[in-house]
Structure formats: C-alpha cells, structure tokens
Amino acid sequence: MLEFFMYPVSGIMKLWHLLFGSFLDGSLAWILTIVFLVVTVRGIIAPLNWLAVKQGRIGALMRPEMTELNAQLRHVTDVNEAVDLLIQQRELKERYKHNPMMGCFPSFIIVPAFLGLYQVVLRVSGSANEPVGLLTLGDVSSFRTSTVFGVPLTDFAREHHDLVLPMLIAALTFTSLNTLITLYRGYLTTLFDQKIPRRLLWFMAIMVTIIPWMLWTVAWHGPIPVTIIFYWGCSYLFTLLQTLVYEAILRKRYPLPEAVHEQRRESIQRWRTKEKKRKKKAAKERFKANPEQKEASAAARKRHSAVLAEARKIVKSNNRPEGPTAAE
C-alpha cells in the first residue's frame, strides 16, 4: 500500500532534483530537493487539511442550535412534531453547509501521503542498493554521497551531535507549538461532559510531551539518518506555519460566538459536578423502589424510538402523512 504512494512522492522528488541539479552542486541540490519535496506534498494536501479543520469549526458553530433541537427531539411524542424537528436539523446543516463525512474523508488521503513521503526519505537514506519508487539507482547513489557541513546525509544522527542538536531542537519546538495551538483550538469547542471528546482532548494534551520525548529518544538512540532529522525540521515548520494560517482564517471568517463558549463552560460545570452520574444513580434508585416505573419508562422509550424511526422515514421520503400514523 505504501509503495503505491511512494511513486508519486518519489516522482516529485526526482523532478525537483532535475531542476536544482541543473545549476547547483550535488549536495545543495539534494538538500533543496528535500525542502521542496515537503513543501510540494504538503501543499497539495493542504486544502484537504483545511477542509477537515473547517468542518470541525462549522460543527462547533452550529452545535448550540443543534443541541436545542436534539433536546426537543428527546421529548417528542408526535410523528409530525418529530418530522418538523428533523427537517429543522437538516435545514440547519444545509445553512451551515456542514458535512461531517467531508471532515473525515481527507484523512484517508492525508495519512497515506504522509507515510509515503516519510518512506521515500527513509529508504533513500538507507543502505539498500535499490531504486526507490521513480528514483533510479543512480539518483539514490548520488543522494547518498551528498553532505551538509561535511557530514553525509545518510550518517546516523547520533554520531553528529553538534550538527543534529540544533535541527532536532528546532523540529521539536515546531511540533510542540503546533500541537499546543491545535490543543487550544480543541479546548475551545470541546464539551467536557461528553466522554469521547474529553478523552480525545486529554490524549492530545499527553501527546504534547510524549511526541517530543519519543522523537528525541529515537534520534539519539535509533538508526535515524541525518536526512530524517532535516526532514522533521522542514515538515514540522511547514505544519506550524499551516496551522497558524488556518487559525488566522478561523478567527476572521469563523469566529466562535459567545453561545459556543457558554456551552463549553456549562459542560465543564456539569462534568465537575458529575451531573450525569448523579442523574443515572437517582434513576436507578427510583426504578429500584418502583419497578413499575421502570417498565413504564422502557415502554415510553420504545414508543419514542418508533416515533423517531417513522419520522426519519418520512423525512427521507419527503412524504408527510395527512392523518395519524401507526406509531401514534
């Protein structure tokens, strides 16, 4: 699978080297090739990244209204009323042009492209005498004779502390800043009383320290060539600049209204007071004391599910019934 993505990436690398190699010496040509390889590949998929970021922000912008509609939908008992609410939800999504699948789809392209980019750089820097994608054996051999400040690009990073340390510190700084900005953006739109979003935010917070530590450890103790450290620096710098641009666009075009901030603050309060757990515990005690109430509640939920199911069918078929329905 990764080899498929290596071919377009290696093709881009070959084209840049043909350009720079026509008027620069071998080492400088290859160094610039790596820089522009990162810029080209990440530049191509930047619109997909933006699409995912924008859909995430749009989802947050429409959430206060959607939450209100969902609250009404939970207590609906009439099919026609449920149909009206479902239509309002659909119109709300259309008004905001929200499509959650469009936010997820780019990941299926972005992740393999990043892996393909990393694999090309890693294999070109390796020791195997074989072509890499569209790069011929001659191209690979030329790359492996290239140096930066007298250090071969394919030497292990741990053998050249004086050269690698500044590049590694820069790379770790770039990725840490990028993660912190993304973390703060996520914090502003996270509902803390919902388990999955809250845990995803905690996971990202942990990654702020884990990722730099992992990269530092691998760089000094693993078989990582100097090329990869240089690639990290270029890649993380581009990602940081991209994130800053996205953040500026979000603040200007899609600012978060006070309703979103208020919803987040209320969710934090509910999470701290463990409101959901208290309600569940109270319901269990109430049902335990009155088993008939538990049966009545289960029957009501069943009727409510039937009403929603029929309402969704009607909305999907755009055919509202004139009289009472089976669910009623």
Question: How would you name each of these model-derived features?
Answer:
Residues 1-32, 135-160:
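Interfacial loop/helix-cap signal at membrane boundaries in integral membrane proteins
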Residues 242-328:
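Cytosolic, positively charged, low-complexity intrinsically disordered regions immediately flanking transmembrane
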Residues 114-123, 130, 135-262:
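Hydrophobic alpha-helical transmembrane segments and adjacent short intramembrane/lumenal linkers
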Residues 30-60, 64, 71, 287, ...:
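Extended low-complexity intrinsically disordered regions
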Residues 15, 47, 51-54, 58, ...:
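Membrane-spanning helices that line or support transport/gating and their immediate boundary helices
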